A protein has these predicted regions:
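N-terminal accessory/capping or targeting/presequence segment of soluble
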Residues: 1-84, 142-149
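Flexible, acidic/His-enriched mid-domain "rim/lid" segments that flank
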Residues: 4, 45, 77-157
């Protein structure tokens, strides 16, 4: 997936082994899958979508094969899955979206994962500012729908 490659390039530029993505918009950007409870971990060579039972089947069907989908719940916490994935990939330097997390959540992730988090929110601002072809097509389609809706109601207004 091209977006994962761009994220990995950003990780290399920042000297990080991985990024923990908790912001829903950035999760969707990275995986193409929209969900509200969980996280995405992107390392230099792997990607993990970690979610609960509500989304597990849809995630497994929707994401590309280069993203590993795992489920938390039933005795396994999200932080455990993140730590296991980090251990599998040898992650030492972990980035996180410092503006998307409360200060308490940021400190809690550091504590439960046993690593210092490195701020990297600007990576996603930079990557998401430049639109790929699929995003441009979606924006054009949305514009056409909005214009048609306006034309349909303009005579009523």
């Amino acid at each position: 997936m091209e977006r994962l490659a761009k994220i990995r390039g950003g990780l290399i530029d920042l000297g990080l082994d991985a990024v923990l993505i908790t912001d829903e918009l950035n999760q969707r950007y990275a995986t193409g899958f929209a969900f509200t409870d969980g996280a995405v971990l992107v390392t230099l060579d792997r990607a993990f979508l970690l979610t609960d039972s509500r989304y597990i089947e849809a995630a497994q069907k929707s994401v590309s094969g280069d993203i590993t989908v795992r489920m938390f719940g039933a005795g396994k916490r999200l932080s455990q899955l993140v730590r296991e994935a980090m251990d599998e990939c040898g992650v030492q330097k972990l980035g996180a979206e410092e503006f998307s997390l409360s200060h308490g959540a940021y400190l809690n992730w550091q504590r439960v994962l046993g690593v210092e988090l490195h701020p990297c929110q600007s990576l996603f601002y930079r990557l998401r500012a430049s639109k790929d072809e699929a995003e441009i097509r979606s924006m054009r389609r949305a514009q056409a729908i909005a214009e048609k809706a306006l034309d349909d109601v303009l005579h009523i207004i």
